[in-house]
Regions:
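N-terminal Rossmann NAD(P)H-binding glycine-rich loop of SDR-like oxidoreductase domains
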Residues: 9-23
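Rossmann-fold scaffold of SDR-type NAD(P)-dependent oxidoreductases
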Residues: 10, 95-108, 129, 169, ...
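Conserved glycine-rich Rossmann-like NAD(P)H-binding loop of the short-chain dehydrogenase/reductase
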Residues: 28-44
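Rossmann-fold cofactor-recognition segment
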Residues: 51-78
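Conserved Rossmann-fold cofactor-binding substructure of NAD(P)-dependent oxidoreductases
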Residues: 72-96
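Catalytic loop of short-chain dehydrogenase/reductase
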Residues: 106-108, 113-126, 131, 141-213
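Short beta-loop-alpha junction of Rossmann-like oxidoreductase domains
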Residues: 178, 220-233
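C-terminal helical subdomain
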Residues: 231-278
Length: 278
């Protein structure tokens, strides 16, 4: 029996994750498990569905039936484990597989010089930006397809998705050691370089476990107009590109749709689909 695909987005309550979840609801037909740190899951779900086509009462809304919200804090492993148990009950591995996983938590405290480095802020960036995605992989990578998995082609065709599954980590161009010409942002740069390393290692594991059925990549979305990057919009306009969030998530999904299994697995790609050097 073909394996039914599903999507995981963590987190989904604000910024890129929020708009990505809404975009996936409208442009795919797959069920989505999305996460929020909020304990008010109903309010979080209503916010994600607000204004979308078919917005009606939950019992009549086909988009609502495809979306499940769960509490998850990437700094608290028990909440990640609980979310994985929910995933297992919603999408039994014998009949389902995780086809798109977006592990995209992130925080940023800029440091222009070593004197501005604060131990607690630095550790928090590593905890959220690197350890968080690692723990997501620990508890959710088991749902990715194996070599013998036969994905449901009809579901993927309707959603315009490739047959291989994708695990995507959120990185940033500043995580490239090769392209570091300006310095600064010591902790954030190091954390994103760590994300790129994690993506490579996970992809090597998937290559053994899943073969051509799954790959892992890191992703640089560009400078996106969210609260996360608000104080840096000016420098982006000066030459590095500034994307509206709806445009950014559309490009993100298009990069996923166009991934080259042979040339791009384990690498970091930007919003144009170009490889960011390590």
């Amino acid at each position: 029996m073909p394996s039914l695909p599903w999507i995981f987005v963590c987190p989904s309550s604000r910024g890129i994750g929020f708009h990505l979840t809404r975009h996936l609801l409208q442009t795919t037909t797959l069920p989505i498990l999305a996460t929020t740190r909020s304990k008010d899951l109903e309010a979080a779900k209503q916010a994600l569905l607000s204004g979308l086509q078919h917005q009606q009462q939950h019992d009549e809304n086909p988009l609502a039936h495809r979306l499940t919200l769960t509490h998850l804090d990437v700094t608290h492993e028990p909440s990640i484990q609980q979310a994985s148990l929910l995933a297992k009950s919603l999408f039994p591995p014998r009949t389902h597989h995780l086809h798109l996983s977006f592990a995209i938590p992130g925080i940023l405290t800029p440091e222009k010089s070593p004197s501005q480095i604060d131990a607690s802020s630095s550790l928090a960036m590593f905890q959220v930006n690197v350890a968080g995605p690692l723990l997501l992989a620990k508890h959710f990578v088991e749902f990715m397809p194996r070599k013998a998995t036969i994905p449901d082609g009809d579901s993927l065709k309707k959603s315009r998705l490739p047959e291989h599954a994708t695990w995507m980590f959120m990185s940033a161009r500043v995580g490239s050691v090769t392209e570091n010409k300006l310095g600064g942002w010591y902790s954030y740069r190091a954390s994103k370089a760590g994300v790129n390393s994690v993506a490579k290692s996970l992809d090597l594991m998937l290559g053994v476990r899943s073969g051509r059925r799954a790959l892992a990549v890191a992703y640089h979305p560009g400078t996106v107009k969210t609260d996360f990057s608000k104080e840096f919009w000016g420098s982006a306009q000066a030459g590095r590109g500034l994307l509206e969030v709806e445009d950014a998530v559309g490009k993100m999904v298009e990069v996923v749709r166009g991934l080259d299994m042979e040339k791009e697995r384990g690498k970091c790609l930007d919003w144009r689909g170009e490889v960011v050097p390590p």
